[in-house]
Regions:
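Mid-core helix/loop region of P-loop NTP-binding domains shared across ATPases and GTPases
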Residues: 2-14, 19, 47-50, 84-86, ...
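Pre-Walker A adenine-sensing motif
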Residues: 35-46
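Walker A/P-loop nucleotide-binding motif
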Residues: 48-73
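Short, well-ordered alpha-helices that flank and scaffold nucleotide-derived cofactor binding pockets
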Residues: 72, 76, 107
């Protein structure tokens, strides 16, 4: 059944580029956005908090790719400097609920919460306590946050 596949010439050079979480090594024509976002988040390399950022634009213009690209470089640099910087990326459309978004925050810092059953306030308290006890800077990315608002009917 699979012999033909194993012998055949692959259609793709690299199937990884088809994954929805793939970020290329280079982002052509996004140098200005990369530089600008990099400047905003760079204070964490010296142990300071960075500003909150709200990025919006049309679908497919590279917002997520730029953010993931810059933050991967930031984490790499922080590691070289011995800084405690972590990134928690959450696609709110995929997470679906505020509870799952908060539980993703918890998971990113090693705090376990049950899949369901706790009040949102309790999950947030566990996250806050866990974050404070670990003494690290956490950058949280909430991609497609509008999905949570639309699902709640607030729009």
């Amino acid at each position: 059944m699979f012999d033909r596949f194993l012998r055949g010439v692959p259609i793709f050079k690299d199937r990884e580029v088809l994954r929805n979480d793939y970020v290329p090594d280079k982002l052509p024509h996004r140098e200005e956005q990369i530089r600008c976002f990099g400047e905003i988040v760079s204070p964490v390399l010296k142990g300071s908090c960075c500003s909150n950022v709200f990025i919006y634009g049309k679908t497919g213009t590279g917002k997520t790719a730029v953010v993931k690209y810059v933050l991967s470089k930031l984490v790499q640099k922080a590691s070289e400097l011995g800084s405690s910087v972590e990134v928690c990326y959450v696609n709110c459309r995929l997470s679906g609920t505020e509870y799952r978004v908060l539980s993703s925050f918890c998971e990113s810092i090693g705090v376990t919460v049950p899949f369901t059953g706790l009040a949102l306030g309790e999950v947030f308290d566990r996250f806050r306590k866990g974050l404070n006890s670990r003494r690290l800077l956490l950058i949280v990315v909430l991609d497609e946050i509008d999905a949570l608002i639309k699902d709640r009917g607030d729009v």
